[in-house]
Structure formats: structure tokens, C-alpha cells
Amino acid sequence: MTVNTLERTIFEKEEIRVIIRLPKYQETYYSYDYQRKVGDQATLNTFLECRVYPLLEKIGLSKNHVEVIDGHGNFPHMHTKLDIIRSSYVK
């Protein structure tokens, strides 16, 4: 799975825009295997700690290699609830 495909898969399942700081077509050899999205009342920090950071560790990356961007193009605070971030995207 390429980085681009991984980012798109996360967005389709979680409705959260994640940017991984690697070349878009670099192979990651890992996939995003979760079937259900994280609940709306969870914070961005919880989402990253439980889902994204463990995946980055498997790829061999640190937490500094990922960003989350809301629908306004901003980097939300780590304590922002996911429903706020999800509702910021144009549907």
C-alpha cells in the first residue's frame, strides 16, 4: 500500500484527513485494518495514540511524521473532539 493509498483509506474509514510525511508513492507494506471509526467524542490525541502512531511505529516513523488537517486547512489542537474535526470538512 502506498502512502497516498494509506492516507485515503484512513480518511474513508475515519473521516479524518491524515498527512504522512513521506513521498506519496512510497510503499508502506502496512495497511489500515480497522473496520469501525473511532467515536465522535474521542479526542484527536486518542485517535492518534490508538490508531495512527502504532501504525507509524510499524513503518519505522516517529510521531513527527504525521499531521492532521481539518476542513479549514488548520492543524487542530490535540484535545479537539473528532466530531468537531469531521464536521469541518465539506461533504
Question: Each predicted region: which residue ranges?
Answer:
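Basic helix-extension-helix modules of the SAP/HeH family
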Residues: 1-91
